[in-house]
Amino acid sequence: MKKKRRRGSGRSINSPQLVSVTHYEVTDKPILDPDYRRLPDYVKNSIERLHREAQIRPRKAILELEALQEQYPHIPQVYNYLAIAYSRIGEIAKAEAIALEGMQVNPDYLFTRLNYAEFCLYKKDYAKVAEIFDHKFDLSLLYPKRKLFHVSEVVNFMGLIGLYFYETQRQDLAQQYYAVLQRLAPNDPMARRLKRRLSPGLFVRLWKRLTRWSASNQTDGI
Protein backbone atom coordinates (compact mmCIF):
# COMPACT_ATOMS: atom_id res chain seq x y z
CA MET A 1 0.00 0.00 0.00
CA LYS A 2 1.31 3.41 -0.93
CA LYS A 3 -0.02 6.67 0.36
CA LYS A 4 0.82 9.66 -1.78
CA ARG A 5 1.22 13.05 -0.22
CA ARG A 6 0.21 15.81 -2.62
CA ARG A 7 0.42 19.56 -2.50
CA GLY A 8 -2.52 21.06 -0.66
CA SER A 9 -3.74 17.64 0.47
CA GLY A 10 -3.84 18.53 4.15
CA ARG A 11 -0.90 16.23 4.83
CA SER A 12 1.67 18.73 3.69
CA ILE A 13 3.63 20.84 6.14
CA ASN A 14 4.27 24.36 4.98
CA SER A 15 6.45 26.73 6.98
CA PRO A 16 8.59 28.99 4.79
CA GLN A 17 11.44 29.40 7.26
CA LEU A 18 11.81 25.78 8.22
CA VAL A 19 10.30 23.27 5.84
CA SER A 20 9.09 22.99 2.28
CA VAL A 21 5.80 21.64 1.00
CA THR A 22 6.43 17.92 1.07
CA HIS A 23 5.96 15.81 -2.02
CA TYR A 24 6.76 12.13 -1.65
CA GLU A 25 5.09 8.76 -1.33
CA VAL A 26 4.72 6.75 1.86
CA THR A 27 4.59 2.96 1.81
CA ASP A 28 4.24 0.18 4.35
CA LYS A 29 6.25 -2.21 2.18
CA PRO A 30 9.87 -2.82 3.27
CA ILE A 31 12.52 -0.55 1.77
CA LEU A 32 15.89 -2.28 2.11
CA ASP A 33 19.17 -0.64 1.21
CA PRO A 34 21.43 -2.53 -1.24
CA ASP A 35 24.03 -3.46 1.39
CA TYR A 36 21.39 -5.07 3.57
CA ARG A 37 19.83 -6.93 0.64
CA ARG A 38 23.20 -8.45 -0.22
CA LEU A 39 23.63 -9.99 3.22
CA PRO A 40 23.23 -13.77 3.51
CA ASP A 41 19.73 -14.76 4.61
CA TYR A 42 20.96 -16.22 7.88
CA VAL A 43 22.62 -12.89 8.77
CA LYS A 44 19.45 -10.95 7.96
CA ASN A 45 17.45 -13.37 10.10
CA SER A 46 19.91 -12.89 12.96
CA ILE A 47 19.67 -9.10 12.73
CA GLU A 48 15.86 -9.23 12.81
CA ARG A 49 15.93 -11.57 15.82
CA LEU A 50 18.45 -9.38 17.62
CA HIS A 51 16.20 -6.36 17.20
CA ARG A 52 13.72 -8.09 19.48
CA GLU A 53 16.32 -9.55 21.82
CA ALA A 54 18.03 -6.17 22.31
CA GLN A 55 14.87 -5.08 24.10
CA ILE A 56 14.07 -8.17 26.17
CA ARG A 57 17.44 -9.93 26.60
CA PRO A 58 19.92 -7.10 26.06
CA ARG A 59 22.99 -8.68 27.66
CA LYS A 60 22.71 -11.75 25.47
CA ALA A 61 22.04 -9.63 22.40
CA ILE A 62 25.11 -7.44 23.00
CA LEU A 63 27.53 -10.33 22.47
CA GLU A 64 26.03 -11.26 19.11
CA LEU A 65 25.59 -7.68 17.97
CA GLU A 66 29.20 -6.79 18.73
CA ALA A 67 30.33 -9.78 16.68
CA LEU A 68 28.13 -8.64 13.79
CA GLN A 69 29.38 -5.07 14.14
CA GLU A 70 32.95 -6.26 13.71
CA GLN A 71 32.08 -8.38 10.69
CA TYR A 72 29.60 -5.97 9.04
CA PRO A 73 30.57 -2.43 10.11
CA HIS A 74 28.64 -0.92 7.19
CA ILE A 75 25.24 -2.24 8.32
CA PRO A 76 23.55 0.58 10.28
CA GLN A 77 20.87 -1.55 11.94
CA VAL A 78 23.55 -3.31 13.99
CA TYR A 79 24.63 -0.02 15.61
CA ASN A 80 21.06 0.98 16.38
CA TYR A 81 20.18 -2.34 18.00
CA LEU A 82 23.43 -2.37 19.94
CA ALA A 83 22.69 1.11 21.27
CA ILE A 84 19.22 -0.07 22.31
CA ALA A 85 20.70 -3.05 24.16
CA TYR A 86 23.20 -0.92 26.08
CA SER A 87 20.43 1.54 26.96
CA ARG A 88 18.36 -1.32 28.34
CA ILE A 89 21.11 -2.31 30.78
CA GLY A 90 21.62 1.28 31.88
CA GLU A 91 24.90 1.99 30.09
CA ILE A 92 23.66 5.21 28.54
CA ALA A 93 27.07 6.74 27.79
CA LYS A 94 28.10 3.58 25.94
CA ALA A 95 24.80 3.53 24.06
CA GLU A 96 25.24 7.15 23.01
CA ALA A 97 28.80 6.53 21.81
CA ILE A 98 27.59 3.62 19.68
CA ALA A 99 24.74 5.71 18.28
CA LEU A 100 27.19 8.45 17.33
CA GLU A 101 29.54 5.94 15.71
CA GLY A 102 26.65 4.44 13.78
CA MET A 103 25.72 7.85 12.40
CA GLN A 104 29.32 8.64 11.48
CA VAL A 105 29.78 5.32 9.66
CA ASN A 106 26.36 5.50 7.99
CA PRO A 107 25.61 9.25 7.70
CA ASP A 108 22.85 8.88 5.10
CA TYR A 109 20.80 6.30 7.01
CA LEU A 110 17.83 8.07 8.57
CA PHE A 111 17.48 5.84 11.61
CA THR A 112 21.09 6.32 12.71
CA ARG A 113 20.42 10.06 12.68
CA LEU A 114 17.19 9.59 14.59
CA ASN A 115 18.85 7.28 17.10
CA TYR A 116 21.63 9.73 17.95
CA ALA A 117 19.21 12.67 17.90
CA GLU A 118 17.19 10.95 20.64
CA PHE A 119 20.22 11.12 22.95
CA CYS A 120 20.75 14.79 22.11
CA LEU A 121 17.08 15.55 22.70
CA TYR A 122 17.27 13.82 26.08
CA LYS A 123 20.30 15.95 27.02
CA LYS A 124 18.48 19.09 25.80
CA ASP A 125 21.22 19.69 23.24
CA TYR A 126 18.75 21.14 20.77
CA ALA A 127 21.38 22.82 18.60
CA LYS A 128 22.92 19.40 18.00
CA VAL A 129 19.55 17.94 17.03
CA ALA A 130 19.18 20.59 14.32
CA GLU A 131 22.75 19.98 13.19
CA ILE A 132 22.17 16.23 12.85
CA PHE A 133 19.45 16.93 10.29
CA ASP A 134 21.41 19.73 8.63
CA HIS A 135 18.64 22.14 9.73
CA LYS A 136 16.33 20.42 7.23
CA PHE A 137 13.09 19.47 8.92
CA ASP A 138 11.38 17.92 5.92
CA LEU A 139 12.33 14.53 4.48
CA SER A 140 12.12 15.87 0.93
CA LEU A 141 14.79 18.45 1.82
CA LEU A 142 16.94 16.01 3.75
CA TYR A 143 16.80 13.37 0.99
CA PRO A 144 16.02 15.30 -2.22
CA LYS A 145 16.69 12.29 -4.48
CA ARG A 146 14.19 10.07 -2.70
CA LYS A 147 10.53 10.03 -3.64
CA LEU A 148 9.47 7.06 -1.50
CA PHE A 149 9.72 6.59 2.27
CA HIS A 150 8.61 3.83 4.58
CA VAL A 151 5.85 4.79 7.00
CA SER A 152 8.17 4.09 9.95
CA GLU A 153 10.69 6.59 8.58
CA VAL A 154 8.06 9.30 8.23
CA VAL A 155 6.44 8.65 11.62
CA ASN A 156 9.69 8.57 13.59
CA PHE A 157 11.10 11.60 11.80
CA MET A 158 7.90 13.63 12.20
CA GLY A 159 7.61 12.62 15.84
CA LEU A 160 11.16 13.48 16.79
CA ILE A 161 11.15 16.80 14.93
CA GLY A 162 7.78 17.59 16.50
CA LEU A 163 9.32 16.99 19.93
CA TYR A 164 12.29 19.16 18.95
CA PHE A 165 9.98 22.03 18.02
CA TYR A 166 8.00 21.59 21.22
CA GLU A 167 11.13 21.69 23.36
CA THR A 168 12.39 24.78 21.52
CA GLN A 169 9.16 26.67 22.25
CA ARG A 170 7.65 26.39 18.75
CA GLN A 171 4.42 24.68 19.63
CA ASP A 172 2.69 25.80 16.46
CA LEU A 173 5.16 23.80 14.38
CA ALA A 174 4.99 20.86 16.78
CA GLN A 175 1.22 20.85 16.29
CA GLN A 176 1.66 20.74 12.50
CA TYR A 177 3.88 17.69 12.76
CA TYR A 178 1.45 16.04 15.16
CA ALA A 179 -1.39 16.68 12.71
CA VAL A 180 0.51 14.66 10.09
CA LEU A 181 1.04 11.84 12.59
CA GLN A 182 -2.66 11.86 13.40
CA ARG A 183 -3.50 11.25 9.76
CA LEU A 184 -0.73 8.75 9.13
CA ALA A 185 -0.36 6.67 12.31
CA PRO A 186 -2.37 8.04 15.25
CA ASN A 187 -1.71 5.01 17.46
CA ASP A 188 2.02 4.82 16.88
CA PRO A 189 4.10 5.20 20.08
CA MET A 190 5.83 8.25 18.63
CA ALA A 191 2.48 9.91 17.88
CA ARG A 192 1.29 9.19 21.42
CA ARG A 193 4.55 10.50 22.84
CA LEU A 194 4.20 13.82 21.03
CA LYS A 195 0.52 14.02 22.00
CA ARG A 196 1.42 13.70 25.68
CA ARG A 197 3.73 16.69 25.39
CA LEU A 198 1.23 18.80 23.51
CA SER A 199 -1.79 17.78 25.60
CA PRO A 200 -0.78 17.23 29.22
CA GLY A 201 -3.08 15.10 31.32
CA LEU A 202 -5.85 16.31 33.58
CA PHE A 203 -3.66 16.17 36.68
CA VAL A 204 -1.00 18.35 35.07
CA ARG A 205 -3.58 20.92 33.95
CA LEU A 206 -5.15 21.04 37.40
CA TRP A 207 -1.73 21.40 39.02
CA LYS A 208 -0.87 24.34 36.76
CA ARG A 209 -4.19 26.03 37.54
CA LEU A 210 -3.64 25.50 41.27
CA THR A 211 -0.13 26.94 41.00
CA ARG A 212 -1.41 30.02 39.16
CA TRP A 213 -4.25 30.44 41.67
CA SER A 214 -1.82 30.17 44.59
CA ALA A 215 0.56 32.70 43.04
CA SER A 216 -2.32 35.09 42.38
CA ASN A 217 -3.52 34.88 45.98
CA GLN A 218 -0.02 35.53 47.27
CA THR A 219 0.21 38.62 45.07
CA ASP A 220 -3.18 39.88 46.26
CA GLY A 221 -2.07 39.52 49.84
CA ILE A 222 0.99 41.72 49.42
Task: State each model region's role.
Residues 67-68, 101-102, 136, 181:
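Canonical positions in the second alpha-helix
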Residues 31-37, 66-70, 139-151:
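Flexible helix-coil transition and linker loops at the boundaries of alpha-helical arrays
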Residues 39-77, 81:
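Alpha-helical segment of the N-proximal tetratricopeptide repeat
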